[in-house]
Regions:
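Acidic, small/polar-enriched beta strand-loop surface segments
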Residues: 153-198
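Extended amphipathic alpha-helical segments with heptad-repeat/coiled-coil character used for oligomerization
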Residues: 127-160, 164-165, 177
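Short, conserved phosphate-binding/catalytic loop or strand-edge motifs used
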Residues: 94-107, 138-145
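Structured loops at beta-to-helix junctions and adjacent beta-edge loops in soluble globular domains
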Residues: 16, 58-60, 150-152, 186-188
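Amphipathic, non-transmembrane alpha-helical segments in extracytoplasmic/periplasmic proteins
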Residues: 13, 57, 70-97, 108-135, ...
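Short beta-strand/loop turn elements enriched in aromatics
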Residues: 1-6
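A generic structural signal for beta-strand entry/edge sites
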Residues: 8-12, 49-54, 139-146
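Surface-exposed cap/loop segments at beta↔alpha junctions
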Residues: 16-100
């Protein structure tokens, strides 16, 4: 699992060839590191080797939240992060999860995707974002999709990671996550007052 702050996580895993996933399986859930929820990943590639099958998957929430209709115009005024997030998630199947107390801010969401609005909230309040899934242990069905905002995940260890002269391998990866299938055209955005002038 490759995890970065406020970006889609990536999951790579492999199975023996005889345990290859059915072609109708598109998503994989793994337990969250802290808590009883799960992280959900969408399988984006399958690479069949001699005796193994390697899979690559990305966190599915990012794609889903980009696919909802655009927010045309919401102007939250003097709200905390939870209140803004609740407005943004109103027409989705996602809800508030754990959201830390934040100060209050004002902003504007104008012709942006749900995901762009969430990222604007994250930047505005300087918080860290995760998406979690709740699963019924008996029926194995998804019962909830949560958006969580933390002041800080994990802890600071003072350790530093670098790569340089002792590099052993380099891997080239191609990514089709930000593929655009539709565009929304907009005009100049001139504000018009109450009188209709011809």
């Amino acid at each position: 699992l490759d995890e970065a702050i406020n970006t889609a996580g990536e999951l790579k895993f492999s199975l023996p060839l005889q345990k290859r996933l059915d072609s109708n399986i598109y998503y994989v859930l793994i337990p969250e590191f802290h808590g009883n929820d799960f992280l959900m990943f969408k399988i984006i590639s399958e690479d069949v080797q001699k005796d193994r099958v390697e899979y690559s998957a990305v966190e599915s929430a990012y794609d889903e939240l980009k696919s909802y209709e655009y927010i045309k115009d919401i102007r939250p005024h003097q709200m905390n992060a939870a209140q803004m997030l609740q407005q943004v998630l109103k027409n989705t199947r996602w809800s508030l999860g754990y959201v830390e107390d934040t100060g209050i801010q004002s902003t504007t969401f104008y012709y942006v995707t749900i995901l762009e609005a969430i990222q604007k909230i994250v930047d505005l309040f300087k918080v860290e974002l995760t998406f979690t899934i709740q699963l019924d242990p008996v029926t194995q069905k998804i019962t909830g999709r949560r958006v969580n905002l933390y002041q800080q995940q994990g802890r600071r260890t003072g350790k530093r990671f670098e790569y340089g002269s002792n590099l052993l391998t380099v891997t080239r990866e191609e990514d089709s996550q930000n593929l655009v299938t539709a565009l929304v055209g907009r005009g100049k955005g001139v504000q018009v007052s109450g009188q209709d002038t011809e």
